[in-house]
Amino acid sequence: MQRPSGRNPQALRPIRITRRYTKHAEGSVLIEFGDTKVICTASVVAGVPSFLRGQGQGWLTAEYGMLPRSTGTRMDREAARGKQQGRTVEIQRLIGRSLRAAIDLNALGENTIHLDCDVIQADGGTRTASITGAWVALADAVAWLKAEGRVTDEPLKRAIASVSVGIYQGVPVLDLDYPEDSAADTDMNVVMGDDGGIIEIQGTAEAEPFTEAEFAAMLSLAKQGIGQLHQLQQQALSH
């Protein structure tokens, strides 16, 4: 089996995390998974949604979008269509759920963190790149809250990262790019914390069901890849 990129089955694409990518947001990152590039920002807003007011806890929510020419052919902006696509809603809910597992909302106080993930170039794995980059932006936003004296306890509980795995030409592979994703027998997205806890698994067989052994092999690959991503996140935060 030869991957289109020439990578071995256990290899991530080249990963690059650039912090402070924009100047206004409390946390901002450009994350690159090969040719997939996503800008992730974390914005702090005083106050919480009405269903949480007066409870002394914070909130975290996420939005996701793709630039019209982030793909091979131009897409209309969702604002021009007048509604979000189901895929967009699904992905931004996934990002929000995943990153809420990273934070102690009680320690956040009555503050809201908005995560915005905007895909500027797509080559597969946009949701996994968004989650991985958004955590770094979140960490910077939390550091800002602490520096401003708006929180006293540590809100961050764990690091969160995500990667795709799949069965391509009968072989479990890590971090699928678009040519692999579009031809894969099985595609799975895994979100995990740096404590080894599993936060979410999304897996789909395209034609034939995958076996329990294949599932275990994919999960093992994902755990390995996410471990590498956690190291890259910490390296980015150290600079």
UniProtKB/Swiss-Prot annotation:
Gene Ontology terms, MF aspect: 3'-5'-RNA exonuclease activity; tRNA binding; tRNA nucleotidyltransferase activity
Binding positions for phosphate per the UniProt entry: R87, G125, T126, R127
Pfam family, one: RNase_PH
One example of a Gene Ontology biological process annotation: tRNA processing
Alphabetic keyword roster: Nucleotidyltransferase, RNA-binding, rRNA processing, Transferase, tRNA processing, tRNA-binding
Cytoplasm found in the keyword field: no
InterPro entries assigned: ExoRNase_PH_dom1, ExoRNase_PH_dom2, ExoRNase_PH_dom2_sf, PNPase/RNase_PH_dom_sf, Ribosomal_Su5_D2-typ_SF, RNase_PH, RNase_PH_bac-type, RNase_PH_CS
EC number(s) reported in the record: 2.7.7.56
Stored SUPFAM superfamilies: Ribonuclease PH domain 2-like (SSF55666), Ribosomal protein S5 domain 2-like (SSF54211)
Name of the top EC class for this enzyme: transferase
Catalytic activity field: tRNA(n+1) + phosphate = tRNA(n) + a ribonucleoside 5'-diphosphate
Quaternary structure and partners: Homohexameric ring arranged as a trimer of dimers.
Function recorded in the entry: Phosphorolytic 3'-5' exoribonuclease that plays an important role in tRNA 3'-end maturation. Removes nucleotide residues following the 3'-CCA terminus of tRNAs; can also add nucleotides to the ends of RNA molecules by using nucleoside diphosphates as substrates, but this may not be physiologically important. Probably plays a role in initiation of 16S rRNA degradation (leading to ribosome degradation) during starvation.
NCBIfam families with a match to the protein in the record: RNasePH
Family note: Belongs to the RNase PH family.
PANTHER family in alphabetical order: EXOSOME COMPLEX COMPONENT, EXOSOME COMPLEX COMPONENT RRP41
Protein name, per record: Ribonuclease PH
